[in-house]
Amino acid sequence: MEKVSFGFSDVSPQEKTHLVGDVFRRVASRYDLMNDAMSGGLHRLWKDDFVRLVQPKASEHILDMAGGTGDIAFRLAKYGTNVTIADINPAMLEVGKKRAIARSIENLTWKEENAEALSFNDNVFDAYTIAFGIRNVTHIQKALDEAWRVLKVGGRFFCMEFSQTKWSGFSNLYKMYSTHIVPKIGQLLANDEDSYRYLIESIERFPNIEKFSDMIKSAGFVQIRARPILGGLVAIHSGWKV
């Protein structure tokens, strides 16, 4: 029987999909808090940098996958880009829709979608973005294959995800902080230690930068690049469909 990782546990694919769904239903209303806890607030700067690298244009249609709360999409929309926000979790989408209304942000389409089996036709998007979402997908390679399928020829793929830093001193410090402090923050502020513990564990089980780059290549992308941040604690991956 196939097993996939859920944090440090190995579970069936169906169980992981269900468990991850539960995690994000619980954290949806406090998603910014979760990201602040895991990044020390730096995720806001990283996302700004990420969108600058995408170089969105007003004439483009971009798919922001696992983007339910709108963090990336709102930044893309500032360029006049048409953005489709897709997320498997309806609770995350509801948070994003409310935030968009409050900010009077337009040019957005909201879709409940599974990254491994998108409902879109082939060759329809100019760019595909996914930030801090792909490590929660049950079958990462399937999601990458789908990203390639729905992109136009000449389309760009951008993924930002936590990884493992190569700065040894910082690595030890962050591991201590993430393992012992972040779950307690989750318990204190959200009464949800388990969800925050899973999110930290999922980082350690995610492929390293080199292996994930190989997976992007296997999906069919070329000109693959990885831009490490803080020694690789976070990396921005990119590739092109030709």
Curated annotation (Swiss-Prot):
GO biological process: aerobic respiration; menaquinone biosynthetic process; methylation
Pathway per the UniProt entry: Quinol/quinone metabolism; menaquinone biosynthesis; menaquinol from 1,4-dihydroxy-2-naphthoate: step 2/2; Cofactor biosynthesis; ubiquinone biosynthesis
Taxonomic superkingdom: Bacteria
Any one GO molecular function term: demethylmenaquinone methyltransferase activity
Binding positions (S-adenosyl-L-methionine): T69, D87, N114, A115
PROSITE patterns cross-referenced by the UniProt entry: SAM_MT_UBIE, UBIE_1, UBIE_2
Reaction(s) this enzyme catalyzes, per UniProt: a 2-demethylmenaquinol + S-adenosyl-L-methionine = a menaquinol + S-adenosyl-L-homocysteine + H(+); a 2-methoxy-6-(all-trans-polyprenyl)benzene-1,4-diol + S-adenosyl-L-methionine = a 5-methoxy-2-methyl-3-(all-trans-polyprenyl)benzene-1,4-diol + S-adenosyl-L-homocysteine + H(+)
Keyword annotations of the record: Menaquinone biosynthesis, Methyltransferase, S-adenosyl-L-methionine, Transferase, Ubiquinone biosynthesis
Protein name as annotated: Ubiquinone/menaquinone biosynthesis C-methyltransferase UbiE
Source organism per UniProt: Zymomonas mobilis subsp. mobilis (strain ATCC 31821 / ZM4 / CP4)
